[in-house]
Amino acid sequence: MRIVKLSPHSLAFPSPEGALRDPNGLLAIGGDLTAPRLLAAYERGIFPWFSPGEAILWWSPDPRAVLFPAERHISRSLKRFLRSNPFRVTLNHDFAAVIAACADRPEEGTWIGPEVQRAYLHLHRLGFAHSIEVWQGDELVGGMYGVAQGALFCGESMFSRTTNASKCALMTFCRHFAAYGGELIDCQVLNAHTATLGAKEIPRRQFLQQLSQLQRKPLAPECWAPQVLPPQQVEPPSPTN
């Protein structure tokens, strides 16, 4: 297996099955972040991840981390927190602010550089990339963004400036996405944060099969219209005797 150098004259990508095992999922190098190339990548289960100033790297890891909205997990402590309804959650109200906040996370390093921000903001303006914002009063305290592929949503990054804000973003989006027929959220690589919310790993081949099926299921345009999302509904605790 070897890393493929992308041609500047073609949007073709190599098969994800040819990706390296170490580092896991590295598939190709080069190309650009134009909208046609980014969309061609997402359609094939491939995403960019690289450091600013360095060559663009393209990835398709195996296994793949995913979250089925119907299987989302809300812990007891998070349920208690959400019952107080401390946040207002919106969709596509301020994409630029969300991706800038994701780039500003120290623990994320600096991979979401200016070039990446410009590219995804362009995708947003074209109607392919979307943001979820979490507000406390008028302050943006959390959120996430990603790229829609029919009934599959490719989550790219999230941030939180106060307790549980990013969890609230993901859980509220799960319910909204499922209500419009969304079936799967791509989390790319499993981490402790998404695992606590119900994300799990599946083989890359299974992910690619689901991607092929779900990207042919377009959701109603109303799903992505700028809007305020209803508060996450959490059942009250069962009464004790």
UniProtKB/Swiss-Prot annotation:
It catalyses: N-terminal L-lysyl-[protein] + L-leucyl-tRNA(Leu) = N-terminal L-leucyl-L-lysyl-[protein] + tRNA(Leu) + H(+); N-terminal L-arginyl-[protein] + L-leucyl-tRNA(Leu) = N-terminal L-leucyl-L-arginyl-[protein] + tRNA(Leu) + H(+); L-phenylalanyl-tRNA(Phe) + an N-terminal L-alpha-aminoacyl-[protein] = an N-terminal L-phenylalanyl-L-alpha-aminoacyl-[protein] + tRNA(Phe). One of its GO terms (molecular function) is leucyl-tRNA--protein transferase activity. The gene is aat. The keyword Ubl conjugation does not apply. One of its GO terms (cellular component) is cytoplasm. Its EC number is 2.3.2.6. Pfam families: Leu_Phe_trans (PF03588). It is found in: Cytoplasm. Functions in the N-end rule pathway of protein degradation where it conjugates Leu, Phe and, less efficiently, Met from aminoacyl-tRNAs to the N-termini of proteins containing an N-terminal arginine or lysine. It comes from Serratia proteamaculans (strain 568). Gene3D superfamilies: Leucyl/phenylalanyl-tRNA-protein transferase, C-terminal domain (3.40.630.70), Leucyl/phenylalanyl-tRNA-protein transferase, N-terminal domain (3.30.70.3550). It comes from the Bacteria. The keyword Cytoplasm applies. This is Leucyl/phenylalanyl-tRNA--protein transferase. Belongs to the L/F-transferase family. GO terms for biological process: protein catabolic process.
